[in-house]
């Protein structure tokens, strides 16, 4: 019988999901994106060759896998064409193996313009978006005014709808934000130039997935960003605009929630965050700088430096609760090699002195919160590219075990390097 496995970030994104999805896709027939857009940056290194995928599921690098983009994804035609071009130039047949829901909202130039205008207006209080129009596109979806992939089938009606919505956006851009209007004709021409390519890949994603379940096929759901960036359960308002948690799988793909068999939460051996928002264990000293240097902590999409800190078990507990995480995959374990001591945040000290073991929901409630640490001895031995768990240093194993104890979730996979072979699978999600 086939399994449906969800791979999602359990922290603030950038946990290394792309590599793990790629690793597990040799067991799957379908790989599905169900939320987010091209603000995701999934980096894969295979035989030394680096690939960064932003929109197309990571399974595209496996010849026997069909990739699906579900209705929960906001789709940029220009980003899709660029990514397809890059892959096809390397001999990867994207058009025969990628299927797209007609219900995907489209990201168009006016969304990007609005994203930039709003961030600029917020100044120092900016959310720290990627500036790719993700939020405005989701707004249009909820407001029921957005254009969707299915609208591309009727070009005449699309042109009319585009005119109306562009008038709406340009009025705000010009009169409120005092920036240039978005050109209607260029926007229309650019979309129409690729419309037939996109509509040629349209399919009923929900029907495909439900048929796959009946046929006993393995399905892998590829999450983007991280659980603590979820629009509802993250550190609002410093969040993304979609449901990054496991609940987004059902609503963003059309497969019912009872058909999810395993939720694999990806965690770094430490924590990182990009952009604004609370980060209790953030380090501002030389240790934080060393983690950033060794971990090469720069965003795959934006190139922005990531904030670094110790592992936060308190925040992870909320991610476990919201996602029903079955097992962890711990990545970048090797980054902690060489430290005299390592720390795990096991509680939050509130401004009134009370120590709690749960994370606040709203960003404002994190103000003045201090981490309560357990300090453990570090390890000097090298764990980079180790592929046998018995070869890991004792202190490293103790660190992993302690994280399992304080979270109540087993570590199913360990990653000690960027390549897909630099991995230890302790519990296979498709056979567990």
Curated annotation (Swiss-Prot):
<dbReference type="InterPro" id="IPR033128">
    <property type="entry name" value="Adenylosuccin_syn_Lys_AS"/>
</dbReference>
<dbReference type="Pfam" id="PF00709">
    <property type="entry name" value="Adenylsucc_synt"/>
</dbReference>
<feature type="binding site">
    <location>
        <position position="41"/>
    </location>
    <ligand>
        <name>Mg(2+)</name>
    </ligand>
</feature>
<feature type="active site" description="Proton acceptor">
    <location>
        <position position="14"/>
    </location>
</feature>
<dbReference type="InterPro" id="IPR001114">
    <property type="entry name" value="Adenylosuccinate_synthetase"/>
</dbReference>
<comment type="similarity">
    <text>Belongs to the adenylosuccinate synthetase family.</text>
</comment>
<feature type="binding site" description="in other chain">
    <location>
        <position position="304"/>
    </location>
    <ligand>
        <name>IMP</name>
    </ligand>
</feature>
<dbReference type="GO" id="GO:0005525">
    <property type="term" value="F:GTP binding"/>
</dbReference>
<feature type="binding site">
    <location>
        <begin position="13"/>
        <end position="19"/>
    </location>
    <ligand>
        <name>GTP</name>
    </ligand>
</feature>
<dbReference type="InterPro" id="IPR042109">
    <property type="entry name" value="Adenylosuccinate_synth_dom1"/>
</dbReference>
<feature type="binding site">
    <location>
        <begin position="41"/>
        <end position="43"/>
    </location>
    <ligand>
        <name>GTP</name>
    </ligand>
</feature>
<dbReference type="GO" id="GO:0044208">
    <property type="term" value="P:'de novo' AMP biosynthetic process"/>
</dbReference>
<feature type="binding site">
    <location>
        <position position="14"/>
    </location>
    <ligand>
        <name>Mg(2+)</name>
    </ligand>
</feature>
<feature type="active site" description="Proton donor">
    <location>
        <position position="42"/>
    </location>
</feature>
<dbReference type="GO" id="GO:0004019">
    <property type="term" value="F:adenylosuccinate synthase activity"/>
</dbReference>
<protein>
    <recommendedName>
        <fullName>Adenylosuccinate synthetase</fullName>
        <ecNumber>6.3.4.4</ecNumber>
    </recommendedName>
</protein>
<feature type="binding site" description="in other chain">
    <location>
        <begin position="14"/>
        <end position="17"/>
    </location>
    <ligand>
        <name>IMP</name>
    </ligand>
</feature>
<feature type="binding site" description="in other chain">
    <location>
        <position position="225"/>
    </location>
    <ligand>
        <name>IMP</name>
    </ligand>
</feature>
<feature type="binding site" description="in other chain">
    <location>
        <begin position="39"/>
        <end position="42"/>
    </location>
    <ligand>
        <name>IMP</name>
    </ligand>
</feature>
<feature type="binding site">
    <location>
        <position position="306"/>
    </location>
    <ligand>
        <name>GTP</name>
    </ligand>
</feature>
<feature type="binding site" description="in other chain">
    <location>
        <position position="240"/>
    </location>
    <ligand>
        <name>IMP</name>
    </ligand>
</feature>
<feature type="binding site">
    <location>
        <begin position="300"/>
        <end position="306"/>
    </location>
    <ligand>
        <name>substrate</name>
    </ligand>
</feature>
<feature type="binding site">
    <location>
        <position position="144"/>
    </location>
    <ligand>
        <name>IMP</name>
    </ligand>
</feature>
<keyword id="KW-0963">Cytoplasm</keyword>
<keyword id="KW-0460">Magnesium</keyword>
<dbReference type="GO" id="GO:0046040">
    <property type="term" value="P:IMP metabolic process"/>
</dbReference>
<feature type="binding site" description="in other chain">
    <location>
        <position position="130"/>
    </location>
    <ligand>
        <name>IMP</name>
    </ligand>
</feature>
<comment type="subunit">
    <text>Homodimer.</text>
</comment>
<comment type="function">
    <text>Plays an important role in the de novo pathway of purine nucleotide biosynthesis. Catalyzes the first committed step in the biosynthesis of AMP from IMP.</text>
</comment>
<keyword id="KW-0436">Ligase</keyword>
<dbReference type="GO" id="GO:0005737">
    <property type="term" value="C:cytoplasm"/>
</dbReference>
<keyword id="KW-0479">Metal-binding</keyword>
<dbReference type="GO" id="GO:0000287">
    <property type="term" value="F:magnesium ion binding"/>
</dbReference>
<feature type="binding site">
    <location>
        <begin position="332"/>
        <end position="334"/>
    </location>
    <ligand>
        <name>GTP</name>
    </ligand>
</feature>
<keyword id="KW-0342">GTP-binding</keyword>
<dbReference type="InterPro" id="IPR042111">
    <property type="entry name" value="Adenylosuccinate_synth_dom3"/>
</dbReference>
<keyword id="KW-0547">Nucleotide-binding</keyword>
<dbReference type="InterPro" id="IPR018220">
    <property type="entry name" value="Adenylosuccin_syn_GTP-bd"/>
</dbReference>
<dbReference type="InterPro" id="IPR027417">
    <property type="entry name" value="P-loop_NTPase"/>
</dbReference>
<keyword id="KW-0658">Purine biosynthesis</keyword>
<dbReference type="InterPro" id="IPR042110">
    <property type="entry name" value="Adenylosuccinate_synth_dom2"/>
</dbReference>
<feature type="binding site">
    <location>
        <begin position="415"/>
        <end position="417"/>
    </location>
    <ligand>
        <name>GTP</name>
    </ligand>
</feature>
């Amino acid at each position: 019988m086939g399994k449906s496995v969800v791979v999602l970030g359990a922290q603030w994104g950038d946990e290394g999901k792309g590599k793990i999805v790629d690793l597990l896709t040799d067991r799957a027939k379908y790989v599905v994106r169900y939320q987010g857009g091209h603000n995701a940056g999934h980096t894969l290194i295979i035989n030394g060759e680096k690939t960064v995928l932003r929109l197309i599921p990571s399974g595209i690098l496996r010849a026997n896998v069909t990739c699906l983009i579900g209705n929960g994804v906001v789709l940029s035609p220009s980003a899709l064409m660029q990514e397809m071009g890059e892959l096809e130039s390397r001999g990867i047949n994207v058009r025969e193996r990628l299927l797209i829901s007609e219900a995907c909202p489209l990201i168009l130039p006016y969304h990007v313009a609005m994203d930039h205008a709003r961030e600029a207006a917020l100044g120092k209080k900016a959310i720290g978006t990627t500036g790719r129009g993700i939020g405005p596109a989701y707004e249009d979806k909820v407001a029921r005014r957005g254009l969707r992939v299915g609208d591309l089938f009727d070009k005449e009606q699309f042109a009319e709808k585009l005119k109306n919505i562009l008038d709406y956006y340009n009025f705000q851009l010009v009169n409120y934000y005092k920036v240039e209007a978005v050109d209607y004709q260029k926007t229309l021409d650019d979309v129409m130039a690729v419309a037939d390519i996109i509509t040629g890949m349209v399919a009923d994603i929900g029907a495909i997935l439900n048929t796959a379940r009946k046929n006993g096929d393995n399905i892998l759901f590829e999450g983007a960003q991280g659980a603590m960036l979820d629009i509802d359960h993250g550190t609002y308002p410093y969040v993304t605009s979609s449901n990054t948690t496991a609940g987004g799988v059902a609503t963003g793909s059309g497969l019912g929630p009872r058909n999810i068999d395993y939720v694999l939460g990806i965690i770094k051996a430490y924590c990182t965050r990009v952009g604004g928002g609370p980060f209790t264990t953030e380090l501002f000293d030389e240790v934080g700088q060393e983690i950033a240097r060794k971990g090469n902590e720069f965003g795959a999409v934006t190139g922005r430096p990531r904030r670094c800190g110790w592992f936060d078990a308190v925040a992870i507990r909320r991610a476990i609760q919201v996602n029903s995480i079955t097992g962890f995959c711990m990545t970048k374990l090797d980054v902690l090699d060489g430290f005299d001591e390592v720390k795990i945040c096991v509680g939050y000290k509130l401004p009134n002195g009370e120590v709690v073991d749960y994370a606040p929901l709203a960003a404002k409630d994190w103000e003045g919160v201090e981490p309560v640490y357990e300090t453990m001895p570090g390890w000097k031995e090298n764990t980079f590219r180790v592929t046998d768990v018995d070869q890991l240093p004792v202190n490293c194993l103790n660190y992993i075990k302690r994280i399992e104890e304080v979270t109540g979730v087993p570590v199913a996979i360990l990653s000690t390097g960027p390549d897909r072979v630099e991995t230890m699978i302790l519990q296979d999600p498709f056979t567990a």
